[in-house]
Amino acid sequence: ETVRGAVLSLGIRRMQDIAMSCCLLKLSPSADCPVDVTVFWEHSFACALLAQRFAQKIGYPNPEAAYLAGLLHDIGIIVNLWMLPEEFSAAINQAHASHVPLHEAELDVLGLTHCESGELLAERWKLAPEMIEVIRHHHHPESAREYRALVALVAVNDLMCRMRRLGHGYQEEYLIDFLEQPAFAILLAEFPNLKKFDWARFTFELESHVEEVQQLVTLVYKAPK
């Protein structure tokens, strides 16, 4: 009855999303994997945690959806790693060398980004529409047609993580003014109190969760099989 109650409470679609995320998180990199996949899941866990906390603070009505969206937003990275390992390795090397965002290096090397490949996987696996929208548009939230607040919420926290030691394994060398980001404008239109948001305190909270996230990813990937 407890499981049945949980399913009824969350809804079938949400349970499908959660089950899918669990499957993704148990994917282990092969021995000859050209990059450390755990780095990307550290970023995804951090983004999920921060997105949920941020959602709670600004009054977004569904913090659980924010967590799941943060967790899944970069699944296209795993797709690119599976399908185009050599090309993706070249892209990540270029991103490291140039200190540019990964999606820019992917576009230059692969001709597509993890946003497009992630969208294809999400559609094939029939993830919820809002998750597909986040996966496709989290680097350009202004291009989202639906669920814009959720897309923008994940976009902001993705940037926060990438600027604070929980990115894609390297430091991106460009300055970010969150108040000038399209994602911030989208959120501000819906949550006016965001003008008073304490960014310094929120950044401090992110720093305090770095070790927690790293321990969680280690547990997932290094637990006895």
Predicted regions and their residues:
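Signal-transmission/dimerization alpha-helices at domain junctions
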Residues: 21, 54-57
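Heme-based O2/NO sensor domains and their adjacent alpha-helical segments
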Residues: 1-31
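Metal-dependent nucleotide-binding catalytic modules
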Residues: 28-38, 49-52, 60-65, 69, ...
